[in-house]
């Protein structure tokens, strides 16, 4: 089920259940997960994209294994807030994924999440090679943490 607002998403979630955050890219999907109290987002892994069926199988395996109740998908809006082709692609991915699972799905504005993740990794003195390996799932954690903070204040 796709929830257009965070309020609708919150109403669809069972209490004390973990969430997943996704940073959807052309080549990779960054994945982060929350604790059951929905306080902290933790980077989990980066999935190399192949085709939708394989990507969805990998994501749904994580959802099942970690008992995820909701998915927060980063929505790559333009800096002026408008939606371009990447937003349309992300919404299409969500529609296709929602056909395969009953898990609630919502969107979170991901503008500058990768920039914030890159900055944090630079401050942690991470090597360039290591940054390229973890940037997507660290960005997913930034996306998920933003949504968790909003959910906490509803």
UniProtKB/Swiss-Prot annotation:
E.C. designation(s): 3.1.-.-
Protein location: Cytoplasm
Short name of any one Pfam family annotated for the protein: RuvX
DNA damage found in the keyword field: no
Source organism, top-level taxon: Bacteria
Chief location category: cytoplasm
PANTHER family: POLYNUCLEOTIDYL TRANSFERASE, RIBONUCLEASE H-LIKE SUPERFAMILY PROTEIN
Protein name in UniProt: Putative pre-16S rRNA nuclease
Species: Ruegeria pomeroyi (strain ATCC 700808 / DSM 15171 / DSS-3)
């Amino acid at each position: 089920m796709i929830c257009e607002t965070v309020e609708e998403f919150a109403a669809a979630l069972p209490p004390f259940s973990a969430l997943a955050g996704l940073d959807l890219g052309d080549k990779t999907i960054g994945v982060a997960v929350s604790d059951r109290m929905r306080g902290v987002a933790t980077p989990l892994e980066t999935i190399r994209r192949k085709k939708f069926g394989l990507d969805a199988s990998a994501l749904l395996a994580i959802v099942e294994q970690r008992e995820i109740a909701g998915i927060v998908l980063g929505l790559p809006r333009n800096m002026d807030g408008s939606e371009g082709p990447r937003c349309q692609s992300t919404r299409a991915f969500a529609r296709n994924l929602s056909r395969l699972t009953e898990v609630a799905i919502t969107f979170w504005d991901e503008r500058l999440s990768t920039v914030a993740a890159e900055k944090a990794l630079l401050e942690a003195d991470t090597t360039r090679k290591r940054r390229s390996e973890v940037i997507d799932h660290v960005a997913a954690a930034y996306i998920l943490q933003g949504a968790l903070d909003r959910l906490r204040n509803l």
